[in-house]
A protein has these predicted regions:
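Intrinsic disorder/low-complexity segments
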Residues: 12, 23, 128-129
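Hydrophobic h-region of N-terminal signal peptides that target proteins for export
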Residues: 16-24
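Membrane-proximal, non-transmembrane alpha-helical segments
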Residues: 79-134
């Protein structure tokens, strides 16, 4: 009887610990996405050549898009996560269109690429805050971005 009570206490304590530890992890996961775009902006600003800046931004968008697609198609995420990822992908696609000047957007001028990279960081941070993505999906995205890059 005492052994059973102890196992229940351990299980209950473990569940509580998982919830307590998951909260900061969730916030950190979104921070990792923000860091990804911030690192891209820093690379853009440290490069003088406009075509290189475009390449850095384009590759960053492509890597994130591939990671989002893989997570979305993995079957490991909920319907709510899929909806959130679709919203995030739509925002990302808008940035790609702005950079390239497609789908009704004017192409970002060479002289504005540094400012555009900052704008992307701010806009993607806001998108990450507005979109609901679970911890599991967020961690999968981060892992895949690291593996793709």
């Amino acid at each position: 009887m005492k052994g059973t009570k102890m196992q229940i206490r351990i299980a209950f304590g473990s569940i509580i610990m998982m919830f307590v530890l998951a909260l900061p992890s969730n916030a950190d996961g979104k921070g990792e996405l923000q860091k990804y775009f911030s690192d891209t902006a820093n690379k853009v600003k440290s490069t003088e050549n406009a075509s290189e800046k475009r390449k850095i931004l384009s590759e960053s968008f492509q890597s994130m898009s591939e990671a989002l697609d893989k997570v979305q198609n993995s079957g490991m995420i909920s319907k709510v996560d899929r909806i959130g990822i679709n919203r995030f992908k739509a925002t990302l696609q808008e940035k790609r269109d702005e950079l390239a000047g497609s789908n009704g957007y004017e192409r970002v001028l060479d002289k504005d690429l540094n400012a555009f990279s900052d704008y992307v960081v701010q806009d993607m941070e806001q998108a990450a805050e507005m979109v609901t993505i679970s911890l599991v999906a967020l961690l999968l995205i981060i892992i895949l971005v690291v593996l793709i890059v």
